[in-house]
Amino acid sequence: MGICASSEQLEHVHETDESIVYVKDEQGRGGRGVESGGARKVASLFSQRGKKGPNQDSVILCQGFGMEDGVFCGVFDGHGRCGQFISKLVRDYLPFMILSHRNALLLADAAADDDDDAAFSDDAAASSSADSSGNSSPQPSASASAQMLEEWRQACASAFAAMDGELKLQPNLDCAFSGTTAVCAIKQGRDLIIANLGDSRAVLATMSDTGYLQAVQLTVDHKPSVPEEAARIKRSGGRVFGLKDEPGVMRVWLPGENSPGLAMARSLGDMRLKRHGVIPAPEVTSRRVTGADLFMVLATDGVWDVLSNEEVVSIVCATPRKQHASKAVVEAAVQRWRAKFPTSRVDDCSAVCLFLHDHTLGTAAAASAAAAAAARKARRASTATPPAS
């Protein structure tokens, strides 16, 4: 799948600043900039520009993805001079590249199954007269569900690599020191597939056995401070260290240059760092949705830098109308930025709340008091230095 974005298209993206896209089906039909009534039934999306320039965050929701009631949602946080263009291109193309790779795997599996069935039929016919007791069908090596999850895992890994390659080929897009994070969730029936790279995050709200609401982090923040990430970068010749005025924030630097100082260890784009350990490979995990799982929140680091997982979950629970949940999360993050870091510029903040059951907020309301108490405790935490940009 080749893509080509003209300079006019990129300028249009910049001028309209359409950070949110809603797609009704996998053919790409849908709307931009607003949530439709259909979107409100399953998710809430919101993005707000910070004080650092154009909004480099992008958000998408696709319904009818992979199956009739399938859902894809994603949050992308661009960085660098062309970050806003890259995050929007990835938002617009990555979901359908994942679907294309998955469909290719399905076709390959179907062809292999046809060959196996033909071979098995020939073997069975040849041996039936010699051993009538050997008629039992061969047992599958894995369940259909496990096979489906593996197909999605492979599709995500392949699509992320292909997307990174397509960015490199864009003649009107400088990806040398610009790129984007990506955190995506695919819901297929009761199965969730989460693909993540960079420092955006996915958090699940679930009820404990004792009736308390819990925030479960589903992804790892791919920062250079993570030992495994730092080791890979150093093996590839990259350098990892923090600046004197922010020693706790590890950044990635080229071998012989004090640039670019990237605050994440994985990304799409950032081509100058690809040979030095900054990889486009997502971490793909899966989870079977249970009756205790209520909703999940995908958000950029503009949210997570100032709000804890527990606070975000409690904010969603305390929102009377679920279509306003993501806006409530973003507005709370902006308020926290202003209160906690009054001399710093507020970062772009974006969130998607994906509701896993129709009764999500009604059930969660019963536990919101406990979650709110946890949030109040978190808010009393001492102030810290401003997070990395």
Curated annotation (Swiss-Prot):
Q: Which SMART domains match?
A: PP2Cc
Q: Which residues bind Mn(2+) 2?
A: 77, 301, 347
Which GO biological process entries does UniProt record here?
Answer: regulation of intracellular signal transduction
Look up the EC number in the record and give it: 3.1.3.16
Q: Which InterPro entries match?
A: PP2C (IPR015655), PPM-type-like_dom_sf (IPR036457), PPM-type_phosphatase-like_dom (IPR001932)
Catalysed reaction(s) here are: O-phospho-L-seryl-[protein] + H2O = L-seryl-[protein] + phosphate; O-phospho-L-threonyl-[protein] + H2O = L-threonyl-[protein] + phosphate
Cofactor(s) the record lists: Mg(2+); Mn(2+)
Q: Which Pfam families match?
A: PP2C (PF00481)
Give yes or no: UniProt keyword Magnesium: yes
Would you say which domain of life the source belongs to? Answer: Eukaryota
Q: Which GO terms describe its molecular function?
A: metal ion binding; protein serine/threonine phosphatase activity
Q: Where is the composition biased (Low complexity)?
A: 121-145
SUPFAM superfamilies, A to Z: PP2C-like
Q: Per UniProt, where does Mn(2+) 1 bind?
A: 77-78
Name the segments for region: Disordered: 119-145
As to how many cofactors bind and how, the note says: Binds 2 magnesium or manganese ions per subunit.
* Domain PPM-type phosphatase intervals: 42-356
Q: Does the keyword Kinase apply?
A: no
Sorted alphabetically, the keyword list is: Hydrolase, Magnesium, Manganese, Metal-binding, Protein phosphatase
- Its family? Belongs to the PP2C family.
**Protein name in the entry:** Probable protein phosphatase 2C 12
